[in-house]
A protein has these predicted regions:
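Hydrophobic protein-protein interaction segments
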Residues: 1-167
Length: 167
């Protein structure tokens, strides 16, 4: 929850995040990862683009992975992405309190065939994928609880603007 979702990351932000990798990445590996992450954002484009809802904790909005100017640019990028009809951004402020799985970044991918749903957990050594019914039910419950504590889309945009003004 301390990083913004990869699909919403601005190129400079991606680079700053990967500079913190342990062990450190070679310049070539860093640029390769940046290029891949930036190209991956294309999934949000086009007529067949999926509808995506991103739940973002205030901690991720306030985490510093570079200079204030770059962070402002990243937050402005979030606002621009939230203008897309297939992108919904909802912020969970600190005031919402704790929630299950607070320490991990979770991607829940669902579609018309429920048996193909998958959960991706980002961990320091890579990603873990879960598809067992019990795991899916648990993570769906976690996300439902998080959604209850998040601001709506318009208040979330206002919140992001407020964070930008704090910089």
């Amino acid at each position: 929850m301390t990083h913004l979702p990869g699909l919403l990351q601005h190129e400079d932000y991606v680079r700053a995040v990967f500079r913190e990798a342990v062990p450190p990445l070679t310049p070539e590996a860093l640029e390769s990862r940046v290029e891949f992450r930036v190209r991956r954002r294309a999934v949000l484009d086009g007529a067949e683009a999926p509808e995506c809802t991103f739940l973002i904790h205030e901690a991720a909005l306030r985490m510093r992975f570079g200079e204030d100017r770059m962070i402002k640019s990243q937050l402005d990028h979030l606002l621009n992405q939230s203008d897309r009809k297939n992108v919904t951004i909802r912020v969970m402020p600190f005031a919402a309190g704790g929630f299950p799985s607070a320490g991990s970044s979770t991607l829940y991918v669902s579609g018309p065939v429920r048996q193909l749903d998958t959960v991706q957990l980002d961990v320091p050594t890579g990603s873990a994928f879960l598809s067992a019914d019990t795991h899916l039910a648990n993570y769906r419950s976690v996300l439902d609880r998080m959604e209850e504590r998040c601001l709506g889309p318009d208040p979330s945009r206002d919140f992001i603007r407020d964070v930008m003004q704090d910089l």
